């Protein structure tokens, strides 16, 4: 059966953001993205930016650097209890970035004493645990490597008690990540994109940093170079997935499998997407024009952790 394709109206918000990624809103409604591909003298010098959505004006708030090593920030989430950003960085691991631009590197090692790997994307569950993909090798000062060919990508959970726990490994470039919740707010399913294989994997969440029953949950269409990147749930638990290199965003029903709908984009390489809180408006980053766009979806987005009051109360 042919998958239906829709073509909503996309509006460009801003452009010229090298490697545009990680769209996120903070609790004040301010919008942030990251520019992972900025370099200085051929070395990583990624940036975290605030975007004025009315004018498109870009303001760099942070250029993370640790011991002379610049960052490659790639994914963002906003905290609930403090208006701060958690940033997955391919060179520096996990960062906490304040809206004034100050930042902290969270962990050099995981709970087992292993050197932390470089991170790409992250998603909070409603209990406040942060689930993270880590497709890079060890953080700086180790040489920069990525798991595009060798399967050394990992998944971490940064728990509410401050532990950085590796929950699985042996992935070929794990990328986008999302958490599905029960109606009462309990997290119960973790979805992880494995870009080169065009697979979406799922796990059952049994508690903080506790997962089991790994299986293929969904398949990304196409034979192009690329695959699943960033993703977000709408309020009906449809999962919208940026299919990098295909000019489409794939829409999966709650049971996964094949997409039930495709959204055609006016650009080839969508990298991530994020709902504006309590609206149908989706902001999309992409790598053809290094730009941010927006369009209207059929439903509101699922509440983010930063929009909840406390666990179980919405």
Curated annotation (Swiss-Prot):
Changing residue 195 to L: 11% decrease in activity. Optimum temperature is 35 degrees Celsius. Ca(2+) 1 binds at residues 21, 120, 175, 229. The active site is at residue 287. It catalyses: diisopropyl fluorophosphate + H2O = diisopropyl phosphate + fluoride + 2 H(+). Changing residue 173 to V: 46% decrease in activity. It comes from the Eukaryota. Changing residue 229 to N: 100% decrease in activity. Loss of calcium 1 binding. 100% decrease in activity. Changing residue 287 to N: 97% decrease in activity. Inhibited by chelating agents. Changing residue 37 to Q: 50% decrease in activity. Monomer. This is Diisopropyl-fluorophosphatase.
């Amino acid at each position: 059966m042919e998958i239906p394709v829709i073509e909503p109206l996309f509006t460009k918000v801003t452009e010229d953001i090298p490697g545009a990624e990680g769209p996120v809103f903070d609790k004040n409604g301010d919008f942030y993205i990251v520019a992972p591909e900025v370099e200085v003298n051929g070395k990583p010098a990624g940036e975290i930016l605030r975007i004025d959505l009315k004018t498109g004006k870009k303001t760099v708030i942070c250029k993370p650097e640790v011991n002379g090593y610049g960052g490659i920030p790639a994914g963002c989430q906003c905290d609930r209890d403090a208006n701060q950003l958690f940033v997955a960085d391919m060179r520096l691991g996990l960062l906490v970035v304040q809206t004034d631009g100050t930042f902290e590197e969270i962990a050099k090692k995981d709970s087992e004493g292993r050197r932390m790997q470089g991170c790409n994307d992250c998603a909070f569950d409603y209990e406040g645990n942060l689930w993270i993909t880590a497709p890079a090798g060890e953080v700086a000062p180790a040489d920069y490597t990525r798991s595009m060919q060798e399967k050394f990508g990992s998944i971490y959970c940064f728990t509410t008690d401050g532990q950085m726990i590796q929950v699985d490994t042996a992935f070929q470039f794990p990328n986008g990540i999302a958490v599905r919740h029960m109606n009462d707010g309990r997290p119960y399913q973790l979805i992880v994109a494995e870009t080169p294989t065009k697979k979406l994997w799922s796990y059952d969440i049994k508690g903080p940093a506790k997962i089991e029953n790994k299986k293929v949950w969904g398949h990304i269409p196409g034979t192009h170079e690329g695959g699943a990147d960033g993703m977000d749930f709408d309020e009906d638990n449809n999962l919208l997935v940026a299919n990098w290199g295909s000019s489409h965003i794939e829409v999966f029903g709650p049971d996964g499998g094949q997409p039930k709908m495709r959204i055609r984009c006016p650009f080839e390489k969508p990298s991530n997407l994020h709902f504006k809180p309590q609206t149908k408006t989706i902001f999309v980053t992409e790598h053809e024009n290094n730009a941010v766009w927006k369009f209207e979806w059929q439903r509101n987005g699922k509440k983010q952790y930063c929009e909840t009051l406390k666990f179980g109360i919405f």
